[in-house]
Regions:
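Zinc-dependent deaminase
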Residues: 1-25, 87-149
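Small-residue (primarily alanine) positions within well-ordered alpha-helices
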Residues: 16, 20-23, 33, 43, ...
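Short, basic and Ser/Thr-rich N-terminal targeting/leader segments
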Residues: 27-31, 77
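Short beta->alpha transition motifs characteristic of CBS
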Residues: 42-49, 125
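Residues that line or immediately flank small-molecule/substrate-binding pockets and catalytic motifs
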Residues: 49, 83, 107
Length: 149
């Protein structure tokens, strides 16, 4: 990965972290996601599972729906998804169905992340990069769960 791409990924991950902070402030599990298409943010979302009483209202699912509406179609073939925590198998399935070619996440999720349970669910040509601003993403999650215990 070039320095320019690394800088871009960090810049967009900071936007996803901003969404995660908003979720934290609302009492939601602090995961944020953004979708970028041709260097333009077309969707911003965070977890809404508590607010909507909907177990499927994950940040990635919300962002995919917004992006599809923005682009007028269900395939996000020119997009990159940035999410603060590794997607779960459900979200990874939706990412695969939407044909997102590039996924960038912050903190790994060894307990519920797709790489452990469903590593082949993404489109076969999809590029998946983890560890971008990993410590910041992990700290926000740890702070949230620490405050709940």
């Amino acid at each position: 990965m070039t320095n320019e791409q690394q800088n871009k990924d960090e810049q967009y991950m900071r936007k996803a972290l901003s969404e995660a902070q908003q979720a934290f402030d609302e009492g939601e599990i602090p995961i944020g996601a953004i979708i970028v298409c041709k260097d333009r943010i077309i969707a911003r979302a965070h977890n809404l599972t508590e607010t909507l009483c909907d177990v499927t209202a994950h940040a990635e699912m919300q962002a995919i729906t917004m992006a599809a509406n923005e682009l007028g179609g269900k395939y996000l073939t020119d997009c990159t998804l940035y999410v603060t925590v590794e997607p779960c198998p459900m979200c990874a399935g939706a990412i695969g169905w939407a044909q997102v070619p590039r996924i960038v996440y912050g903190a790994a999720d060894p307990k519920r992340g797709f790489q452990e349970y469903a590593p082949r669910v993404l489109h076969p040509k999809a590029e998946c990069i983890g560890g971008i601003l990993e410590e910041e993403c992990r700290q926000l999650m740890q702070e949230f769960f620490k405050s709940r215990r």
